[in-house]
Regions:
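Conserved SET/PR-domain catalytic core that frames the SAM/AdoMet-binding pocket
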Residues: 47-64
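Non-catalytic, conserved peripheral segments adjacent to functional cores
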Residues: 1-50, 68-70, 75-127
Length: 127
């Protein structure tokens, strides 16, 4: 399963992400218009075994791909979830060019929502 690059538009959420079962590749993309790293990504492998955590700051998009048969996350968020406030960017945006570790993954499973996201250029998402 791959969860595309998603975010809250009016209520940006910071997330401290930890995996308590399985393994994922977790990604954050900077969407702060005045940032020198706007449109750049950072990713880490998080697993129950390595016990790493990743902080995704507010005004960043967040995505992940599950690398194990199953995975469970724990999030600590800075803002409540607002389902009507969701936005996103296509997971394979060529300008962002996330290097997803997809070796050994036969089929990428995306939600209907994630299939509809446009590129960063097309969506013009900036904070």
């Amino acid at each position: 399963m791959l969860r595309g690059l998603h975010l809250q538009l009016k209520y940006p959420q910071g997330k401290l992400v930890r995996v308590i079962k399985g393994e994922v590749f977790d990604v954050g993309v900077d969407l702060r218009a005045d940032s020198p790293t706007y449109g750049k990504w950072h990713g880490e492998i998080l697993s129950a075994e390595n016990k790493k955590q990743l902080y995704i700051p507010p005004k960043f998009a967040h995505g992940f791909v599950v690398l194990s048969d199953e995975a469970e996350f724990v999030y600590k968020c800075t803002e409540f979830y607002h389902g009507e406030d969701v936005g996103g960017i296509m997971w394979n945006d060529p300008d962002i060019a996330v290097e997803w570790p997809l070796e050994g993954i036969d089929e990428i499973t995306l939600s209907d929502k994630d299939k509809k996201w446009k590129s960063l250029k097309e969506s013009q998402i900036k904070y």
